[in-house]
Amino acid sequence: MDKIKTTHVGSLPRSKKLSEILFRKDKNELFDQGELDKIIEEDVNKIVKKQIDIGIDIISDGEMSKISYATYVKDRLHGFSGESERRAPKDLDDFPSYKEKIAKSGGTPTYTRPCCTADLKIKDTKSLTKDISNLKSALKKNNHSQGFINSASPGVISNFLPNKFYKNDDDYLVALSKMMKTEYDEITKNDLLLQIDCPDLALARHMTFKNVSDEEFLVRAEKQIECLNEATKDIDASKSVSYTHLTLPTTMLV
């Protein structure tokens, strides 16, 4: 019988020490970059070893360096500023008292979510280089070969960091896909698998596009898939690419 390899969606719990510094960085408060780099490297080593110890085959870095799976992009690209409007999901709109209870609970972390207010350009490539180096180093220390790094899709970025600059959302998606292509290509060129987080094909239906018809949403979804295909066109066909479509209890890997 062939072995069925095990993996997961990528993001894993950060240590309290790491979380505190990531939030300070996210809020533009003072932090020590050298200390942050050291903690990330140490925590990646720990989380890689833990995954291997429990029997996971395809290992991730746990996204230790990222404040969230989508909004980390604001730190790697020029063109974001201000703060975006927070949209409650449609299913919560239907139950306002419950929505109010959730909002008051304080259980959901508040990340900085700016808008796109200028032409997008690459700002920081060092963070990705460090992510790749940390994961490959940890894999080597633990005599393991297969690992993957998560990267946000153009569509999910546009959901959390909305367009306030480009003529229309199509132009914004095209610009995002050009920027993210660099990240996708770099991950796969370094012999790592790529997992693209794209819940925009489901999550955005009841957030960004909650007030449009099904027909209008399908047009938007087609454009997002088109841009994602363009961004991944140069990835070697022998490389595995997985796409996480849902942020609900079930995650579909294609």
Task: Report each predicted region and the residues it spans.
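Conserved small/polar residues in nucleotide/adenosyl-binding loops
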Residues: 244-250
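Class II aminoacyl-tRNA synthetase catalytic cores and aaRS-like
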Residues: 1-11
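Active-site-proximal, glycine-rich beta->alpha crossover segments in alpha/beta enzymes
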Residues: 9, 13-28, 81-219
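Alpha-helical packing segments of well-folded alpha/beta enzyme cores
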Residues: 36-48, 131-135, 176-184, 224-231
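Conserved, mostly hydrophobic/aromatic
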Residues: 4, 51, 149, 187, ...
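TRNA-binding/sensing appendages of the translation machinery
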Residues: 29-70
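Acidic, glycine-rich loop-and-beta core segments that form the ion-binding/anion-interacting portion
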Residues: 213-241
